Amino acid sequence: MLDKTRLRIAMQKSGRLSDDCHELLSRCGIKINLQQQRLIAFAENMPIDILRVRDDDIPGLVMDGVVDLGIIGENVLEEELLSRRAQGEDPRYFTLRRLDFGGCRLSLAASLDTEYTGPQCLQNKRIATSYPHILKQYLDKQGVTFKSCLLNGSVEVAPRAGLADVICDLVSTGATLEANGLREVEVIYRSKACLIQRDGEMPADKQQLIDRLMTRIQGVIQARESKYIMMHAPSERLDEIITLLPGAERPTILPLAGDKSRVAMHMVSSETLFWETMEKLKALGASSILVLPIEKMME
């Protein structure tokens, strides 16, 4: 029996999204023992319980109030939402924030020798998918009638098996499609992982814990998207150098011993620093340029 006074978070039991979730919580300073393959894991340093379940169970657990929070792909969340609405339900939850991992897209894919001219050419075609409601919503907007073939796995084999003319499946790199003689022809939904919270009143102590967790998550994501930059630069070209680093806060400027014409610059940049940018910095007279990762960050 779960202790309802503790914050309950549902996340995927295994897979890439699970690994990303565990890394996020770890970087937030939450210590969880995941050595044993238990369905429930307990945080050692915070009143938090982790429910490790199938990804398609997570939206329902949040919407039904079984857990307080869930980390889930937007594609799975949207499919469950549309499914419940189709059954006349009014599912309640709210999204706390989109996360910076779990990126994928739900796409239509056809055989390499199939001519695709747009959604209209799918009229009355058989389409295999694990996301029938998202697919229907998309094709309804296009005015296309189709025959759905529901598969819960191995969707990419449907055309070769004669089950469908086209498939609608998740795509990350496209390697699986290529291996099965398919090509991506239309993206219908783009997804990332997100953090959702159940609807309804939350006890004050739980809400305070959620607020603390959100602050830490924001800090982790911001740190991953930022770099700490140090360099030596000519004093007369500081404005030009700062212009090359959009998203950077105003830098810290320190004098260099024995050289009044140059300074040391330290700054946090929220932009990716490409080699081209570093070459431009060097052309402006910057030297000893260091770009360092940031582990934690709090504004």
Curated annotation (Swiss-Prot):
The keyword Ribosomal protein does not apply. One of its GO terms (molecular function) is ATP binding. One of its GO terms (biological process) is L-histidine biosynthetic process. Feedback inhibited by histidine. It is found in: Cytoplasm. Keywords: Amino-acid biosynthesis, ATP-binding, Cytoplasm, Glycosyltransferase, Histidine biosynthesis, Magnesium, Metal-binding, Nucleotide-binding, Transferase. One of its GO terms (cellular component) is cytoplasm. InterPro entries: ATP-PRT_HisG_long, ATP_PRibTrfase_cat, ATP_PRibTrfase_CS, ATP_PRibTrfase_HisG, HisG_C, N-reg_PII-like_a/b, N-reg_PII/ATP_PRibTrfase_C. SUPFAM superfamilies: GlnB-like, Periplasmic binding protein-like II. Equilibrium between an active dimeric form, an inactive hexameric form and higher aggregates. Interconversion between the various forms is largely reversible and is influenced by the natural substrates and inhibitors of the enzyme. Catalyzes the condensation of ATP and 5-phosphoribose 1-diphosphate to form N'-(5'-phosphoribosyl)-ATP (PR-ATP). Has a crucial role in the pathway because the rate of histidine biosynthesis seems to be controlled primarily by regulation of HisG enzymatic activity. This is ATP phosphoribosyltransferase. It comes from Yersinia enterocolitica serotype O:8 / biotype 1B (strain NCTC 13174 / 8081). The lineage of its organism: Bacteria, Pseudomonadati, Pseudomonadota, Gammaproteobacteria, Enterobacterales. The gene is hisG.
